[in-house]
Amino acid sequence: MNHVGRKCSMSAIVGATNAGKSTLVNVLVGQKVAAVTPKVQTTRVRMHAVSNHENVQLIFIDTPGIFSPKTKLEKFLVKHAWMSLKGIENVIVLVDVKNYLNQHLKKIIDRIKHSNLNAILVLNKIDIVHQSIVSEVIEYMYSLYKFSKAFTISALYGIGIDKLVDYLCETSPYGPWLYNDDQISDAPLKFFMAEITREKLFITLRHELPYSLSVVTELVEEKEDNSLIIKQVIYVTKGSHKTIILGKKGEMVKKISMESKSDLENILQVKVHLFLFVKVREFWQNHLNECVGYAE
C-alpha cells in the first residue's frame, strides 16, 4: 500500500444516551455497522468504523452513551466509552438539540476540559426544531466549553454531514492508513451478526423489554452451497422476558428471526439459515461473551 500523500485521523463520538451516535456512524461509513434503535444504551462496546475519502481515511469510534453507572454492566459500558478518548485526534461531542440540558452531557464536557483534545460540537436532530432553538443550544454549549468547531446535522436525513466530513478530511494529519481500503470496521463478523439481531429485538419489543438483554453469535458455518448457518443465543435475565421474545406459539421470535435473516442476507450477499435460541441467565452481565456479542 502506498502511504505517500495519505492522511488519517481518528475521532471518538461521545454524547449522552440516545443522542444518535450509532446513526451518525452508519451515515458516515455509508452502511450499517452499529445497531440503531429507539432504546437507550444499545451500543455495548467501542467500535472502530472506517470511511475512506480519496487520500484520507477517517476512523470513527462509536462509544456507549456516557451516563452515571450503577450495575457492573453499566460500569463496563462507561469505562469503554472513556477508554476511546486515548490516542485520538478529535472528540466529536454529539448533542441532541431537544435534550441538551443533560447532567451527563455536563460530565462529558468536564472530562474533555482535562483531555487537551480537539473537541468538535455536533448538534443532531436539527430537522425537528426551529433554527432559533439551534442557535440557543450552540450558545449554551459554548458557555460550557470553547469548541474548535460547531456543526449542525440531522444524522437520520443526512443533513450537514458533508460539511463535517470535509472539515475532518482537511484537518487530518498526514500518515499511513490504519485499515485496508475495503475494510469498514474492526469488529468481528460475529459481532456484526449479533448487532443485527439485537437491533431487531429492540425495535420490535422496545416497549416491553429492558436493554438488559444480549445476543451472542455462537456459530457461523459455511455450507457447500456457500450459504451460512448462523446460531445465536438471546440472553435475558428473567423468564418473563423469554416468554415475551418467544411470543404466542413462537410467532414473535420467528418474526424477529425473519427480519434479522433478511438484513444479514442483504449485507452478506449470501443465503442465511438463522437459528435463534432464548436462554435465561440471571447474571449474564458478568460474562464477557454476553457483553460483547460473540463467542470464540
Curated annotation (Swiss-Prot):
Residues 7-174 form the Era-type G domain. Residues 62-65 are annotated as: G3. Residues 15-22 are annotated as: G1. Belongs to the TRAFAC class TrmE-Era-EngA-EngB-Septin-like GTPase superfamily. Era GTPase family. It is a peripheral membrane protein. Monomer. Residues 41-45 are annotated as: G2. This is GTPase Era. Its main location: cytoplasm. GO terms for molecular function: GTP binding; GTPase activity; ribosomal small subunit binding; small ribosomal subunit rRNA binding. Keywords: Cell inner membrane, Cell membrane, Cytoplasm, GTP-binding, Membrane, Nucleotide-binding, Ribosome biogenesis, RNA-binding, rRNA-binding. GO terms for biological process: ribosomal small subunit assembly. Residues 124-127 are annotated as: G4. It comes from Ehrlichia ruminantium (strain Welgevonden). It is found in: Cytoplasm; Cell inner membrane. Residues 205-282 form the KH type-2 domain. GO terms for cellular component: cytoplasm; plasma membrane. Gene3D superfamilies: 3.30.300.20, P-loop containing nucleotide triphosphate hydrolases. InterPro entries: G_ERA_dom, GTP-bd, GTPase_Era-like, KH_dom-like_a/b, KH_dom_type_2, P-loop_NTPase, Small_GTP-bd. An essential GTPase that binds both GDP and GTP, with rapid nucleotide exchange. Plays a role in 16S rRNA processing and 30S ribosomal subunit biogenesis and possibly also in cell cycle regulation and energy metabolism. GTP binds at residues 15-22, 62-66, 124-127.
